[in-house]
């Protein structure tokens, strides 16, 4: 997860990895595994202000800025969402705020996970992406006040 | 090979009448276990909709042309069918609404606003769907009334003694669910109604889940209001009914103002139409309401008793099969239930279960089932719910069990 890699490069790597799976089981087992491997969110950040509430599952997220790059940590009570969140962190963490704000986040479509962004899922994933971008915007404004 | 003890009940033949059940989902045959959310529609219902729009689409009650007469006759035929289906004494007591939610809101907005005062008490139960909580909360807030909630046992059963203790001369209304959508538990509504009436309260029954499974006789129950939705009984969405005792309906102010609900209008004063039209402002959902009759006729042609025997067998088979799975716990595992089984699995979030079952072609409902207070009371964030209909089979339940084993393996 080198800082030098751009969002596009990381997204392409993920799409590449997923192209190796030929069954839905393999794909989901990989996502579940990603979820399990996501470093735990420090308990101090697992509070209501950091909650991104979906209808069925909850995501907690915290962000910080270091040397002009935004870093995210997160957790979820549902494992598949947590796995997808882990992919989002892999893509966005360590990027300049500007890049996060402007990223189209196409890889979720490309790995066949579009349904998780659908309204019916209410998984909080859509809200998660929005919040990651809002945080990036907040850090950008804070770092370089107009 | 007929599978139930009900004589002549051939579930495989029955399935052929539901076009959607022939569908495949991600390479698997569709297993539809979300019937408590909405049931699938038989071909006769779908055909009735197409036939209406192809042959006699017209606005009802006003036109004098043939199409209007045909449409009006079909629409009113549904009212008579509903009357018989729920045992109302007259068609004037059957108000068409968009469904259970609108029926409850109609009562809270009309009877409620006219009769509830500051300090009055409204009793509901912990098992209620949000649709039978929020309208009363809104009314209580507006009027300064108090909402009281009947507690449940650890298994989810209505505690009758606690209910009796809540009843007093302050109680103006009791509104309870007949069968819980989240757990399937059947409430002792007849006893609830008798006790509430003794205290001088009016009783509303939310029949959204019960009407498709149980024999409904509003006169025998002696409830004051009863609500149900067409789409949960194999009929179209967007229609349903409110039953109300005639004397209550007559005394109630109208709900919506507009066409159909009026007798005469001048800018000074409007006089309202007679029952049931007083509560049916505007052009109603004609097509879906006409097709609801076909759904009810379909149920009647098979026989509720036969359907119930089949569904009860599915329910006990599913309950036993699911309970045999290590780490799986059935919530609301009591004797008197409609065919709903709600469960949790240790260490696995319901959403993950739902997603991984969907990938195997199995449609279940996961989450809080619009009963957040009940979920809090049961101390779970949500459950996975499989709910069965007349067309489900034991083989499908076997697929569910197999599917859950796969979920567990994938999550391990």
Task: Identify the meaning behind each predicted range.
Chain A
Residues 94-111:
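Glycine-rich phosphate/pyrophosphate-binding loops
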């Amino acid at each position: 997860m080198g800082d030098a890699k751009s969002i596009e490069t990381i997204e392409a790597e993920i799409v590449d990895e997923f192209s190796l799976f030929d069954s839905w089981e393999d794909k989901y087992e990989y996502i579940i595994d990603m979820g399990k491997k996501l470093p735990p969110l420090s308990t101090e950040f697992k509070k209501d202000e950091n909650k991104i509430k979906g209808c069925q599952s909850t995501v907690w997220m915290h962000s910080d800025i270091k040397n002009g790059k935004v870093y995210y940590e997160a957790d979820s009570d549902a494992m598949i969402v947590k796995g997808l969140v882990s992919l989002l962190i892999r893509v966005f963490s360590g990027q300049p705020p500007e890049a996060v704000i402007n990223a189209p986040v196409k890889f979720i479509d490309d790995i066949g996970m579009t349904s998780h962004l659908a309204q019916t899922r209410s998984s909080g994933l859509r809200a998660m992406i929005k919040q990651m971008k809002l945080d990036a915007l907040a850090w950008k404004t804070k770092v370089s006040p107009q | 090979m007929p599978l139930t003890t009900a004589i002549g009940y051939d579930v495989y033949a029955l399935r052929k009448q539901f076009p959607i059940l022939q569908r495949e989902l991600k390479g698997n045959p569709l297993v539809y276990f979300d019937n408590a959310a909405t049931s699938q529609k038989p071909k006769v219902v779908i055909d009735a909709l197409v036939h209406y729009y192809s042959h006699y689409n017209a606005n009802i009650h006003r036109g004098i042309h043939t199409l209007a007469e045909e449409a009006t006759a079909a629409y009113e035929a549904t009212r008579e069918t509903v009357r018989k289906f729920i045992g109302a004494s007259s068609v004037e007591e059957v108000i068409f609404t968009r469904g259970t939610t609108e029926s409850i809101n109609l009562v809270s907005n009309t009877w409620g606003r006219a009769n509830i005062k500051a300090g009055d008490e409204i009793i509901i139960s912990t098992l209620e769907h949000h649709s039978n909580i929020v309208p009363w909360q809104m009314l209580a807030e507006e009027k300064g009334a108090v909402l009281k909630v009947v507690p449940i046992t650890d298994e989810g059963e209505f505690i009758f003694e606690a209910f009796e203790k809540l009843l007093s001369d302050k109680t103006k209304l009791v509104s309870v669910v007949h069968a819980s959508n989240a757990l399937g538990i059947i409430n002792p509504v007849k006893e609830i109604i008798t006790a509430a009436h003794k205290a001088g309260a009016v009783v509303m029954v939310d029949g959204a889940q019960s009407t498709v499974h149980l024999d409904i006789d509003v006169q025998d129950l002696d409830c004051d209001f009863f609500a149900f939705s067409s789409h949960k009984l194999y009929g179209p969405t967007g229609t349903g009914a409110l039953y109300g005792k005639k004397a209550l309906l007559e005394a109630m102010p109208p709900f919506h103002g507009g066409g159909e609900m009026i007798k005469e209008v001048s800018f000074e004063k409007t006089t309202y139409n007679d029952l049931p039209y007083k509560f049916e402002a505007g052009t109603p959902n004609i097509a879906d309401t006409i097709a609801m009759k076909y759904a009810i006729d379909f149920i009647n042609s098979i026989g509720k008793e036969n359907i119930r025997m089949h569904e009860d067998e599915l329910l006990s088979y599913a309950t036993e099969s699911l309970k045999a799975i290590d780490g799986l716990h059935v919530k609301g595992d009591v004797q008197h239930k409609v065919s709903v089984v709600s469960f949790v699995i240790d260490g696995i979030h319901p959403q993950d279960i739902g997603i991984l079952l969907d990938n195997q072609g199995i449609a279940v409902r996961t989450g809080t089932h619009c009963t957040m207070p009940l979920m809090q009371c049961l101390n779970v964030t949500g459950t996975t719910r499989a709910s069965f209909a007349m067309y489900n089979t034991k083989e499908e339940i076997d697929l569910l069990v197999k599917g859950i084993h796969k979920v567990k393996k994938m999550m391990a």
